[in-house]
């Protein structure tokens, strides 16, 4: 029989992505559509792709020949990939292993950014054994793209989070007890509710269990994952009524066993799980150099301090108070120590190794010579800067400035131009003087910006620029009078003045 004539409607184009400097893998076939029947796969012979074509981020077309068909196959090849990876910073107390971020911000050639997982090098304990700074290298997972973690180790600490409290959605951190009264479960001691009365009756007790001593502790977890904690404090709120009270004697201990402890099957009565490592006295050591606000009493939070230990668990082992039938705890707290990260920083941008003048947080757009500039940036006070290059015509170079605590302070855009007028640096000629009136004893709120006048080709231009003020004298607001503060206009050799009147 005669076969029905078919005409080619089109050859479906294909889209392929590749990274810079990587030749694309083009499909062996293309789909040919006819005016009748189904499309068919046909072998394609593609034009060669050169190294120059994949040497920059862009999209180009590759033609292909299909045997017996006049129409050409087309492949749209997009060269894309990660063009910048941020560096990050953390702080840690002396002797505590720093927490390594799981991910960093990566910037893609398509203009988007995303959180990329990182594989970090190993941390040497000597690196955080004393005050100082060190840098840890890392790579974006599955790539050779490098990043760095800047770690500052310090003895200057402040109180951090309560690492004993329950974490929503997980059993860890876990409160556990050797024994408990069924009506007063141990989960009450880390539920963030402190009550020394029956309204509410929120406590653990071992009332009526007739034990000479019992223990209550915390098994640590970080975001629900079993982990060690560096611990040097314990805060215990004992409760008292006619049947229970604060212990007559106590010992604070930390878990020192070699076996990683599992979550007890019954946290209220760990002693019933005979083979659990918590039941082996050899796995516990008494803390050293214990200090406490005396006397230890019920009805308040009692604060214990001791030498720092690195452990999975801490407990208080208690003897039942005389004339009572048990001990009682409303809440247990253990606070991490942390090094306060810097929240401020100043940025320096360099173009071809020359400092870009006039960089101020109140101005985000700058113009630089378009002829292949090399841009880098640095930040003061342990801040960091990420330079995201321009990969498409008309796109600016971006500089993201972050403080040590991770706050993005500003994003600057460096526009590439050959326009002499745009490249011209205006000269500042004057700073507006400011004034404030406050009442005696009131707080003084300082302006974050000042007006600065620049001389232009056709007149004067006024800009609001960020200023750093000197500290207010300690007693200046405690009595009537006036004083003058000076401030530094960021990015310029300019001094601002603010007159303050106190009445």
Model-derived segments and spans:
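Extracellular carbohydrate recognition and processing domains
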Residues: 269-307
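Beta-rich interaction/scaffold domains
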Residues: 2-161, 338-376, 380-503
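Aromatic, loop-rich ligand-recognition surfaces of beta-strand-rich domains
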Residues: 198-270, 298-341
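Non-catalytic extracellular/lumenal accessory regions of secreted precursors
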Residues: 191-205, 352-360
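Ordered hydrophobic segments in well-structured contexts
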Residues: 76, 80, 135-137, 148-150, ...
């Amino acid at each position: 029989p005669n076969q029905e004539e078919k005409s080619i409607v089109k050859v479906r184009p294909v889209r392929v992505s590749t990274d810079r400097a990587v030749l694309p893998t083009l499909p062996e076939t293309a789909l040919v559509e006819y005016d009748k029947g189904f499309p068919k796969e046909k072998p394609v012979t593609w034009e060669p792709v050169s190294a120059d074509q994949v040497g920059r981020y862009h999209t180009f077309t590759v033609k292909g020949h299909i045997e017996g068909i006049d129409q050409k196959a087309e492949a749209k090849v997009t060269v894309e990939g990660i063009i910048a990876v941020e560096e990050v910073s953390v702080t840690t107390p002396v002797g505590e292993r720093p927490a390594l971020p799981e991910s960093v911000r990566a910037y893609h050639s398509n203009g988007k950014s995303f959180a990329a997982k990182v594989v970090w090098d190993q941390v040497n304990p000597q690196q955080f054994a004393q005050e100082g700074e060190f840098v840890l290298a890392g790579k974006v997972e599955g790539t050779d793209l490098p990043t760095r973690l800047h770690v500052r180790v310090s003895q200057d600490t402040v109180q951090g989070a309560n690492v004993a409290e329950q974490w929503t959605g997980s059993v860890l951190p876990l409160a556990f007890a050797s024994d408990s009264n069924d009506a007063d479960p141990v989960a009450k001691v880390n539920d963030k509710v402190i009550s020394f009365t029956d309204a509410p009756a929120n406590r653990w007790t071992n009332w009526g269990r007739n034990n000479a001593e019992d223990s209550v502790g915390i098994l640590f977890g970080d975001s629900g994952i079993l982990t060690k904690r560096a611990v040097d404090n314990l805060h215990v709120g004992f409760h008292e009524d006619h049947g229970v009270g604060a212990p007559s004697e106590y010992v604070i201990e930390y878990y020192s066993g070699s076996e990683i402890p599992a979550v007890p099957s019954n946290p209220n009565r760990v002693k019933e799980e005979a083979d659990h490592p918590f039941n082996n006295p050899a796995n516990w050591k008494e803390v050293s150099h214990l200090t406490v606000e005396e006397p230890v009493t019920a009805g308040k939070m009692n604060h214990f301090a001791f030498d720092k230990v690195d452990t999975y668990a801490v407990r208080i082992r208690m003897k039942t108070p005389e004339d009572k039938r048990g001990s009682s705890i409303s809440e247990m707290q253990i606070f991490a120590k942390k090094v306060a990260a810097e929240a401020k920083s100043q940025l320096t941008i360099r173009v071809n190794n020359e400092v870009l003048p006039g960089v101020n947080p109140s101005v985000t757009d700058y113009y630089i010579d378009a002829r292949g500039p090399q841009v880098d940036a640095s930040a003061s006070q342990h801040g960091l800067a990420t330079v995201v290059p321009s990969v498409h015509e008309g796109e600016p170079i971006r500089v993201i400035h972050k403080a040590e605590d991770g706050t993005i302070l500003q994003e600057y855009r460096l526009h590439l131009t050959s326009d002499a007028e745009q490249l011209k640096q205006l000269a500042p000629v004057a700073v507006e003087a400011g004034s404030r009136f406050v009442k005696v004893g009131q707080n003084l709120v300082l302006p974050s910006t000042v007006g600065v006048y620049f001389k232009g080709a056709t007149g004067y231009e006024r800009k609001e620029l960020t200023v750093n003020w000197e500290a207010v004298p300690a007693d200046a607001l405690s009595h009537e009078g006036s004083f003058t503060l000076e401030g530094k206009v960021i990015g310029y050799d300019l001094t601002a003045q603010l007159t303050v009147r106190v009445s």
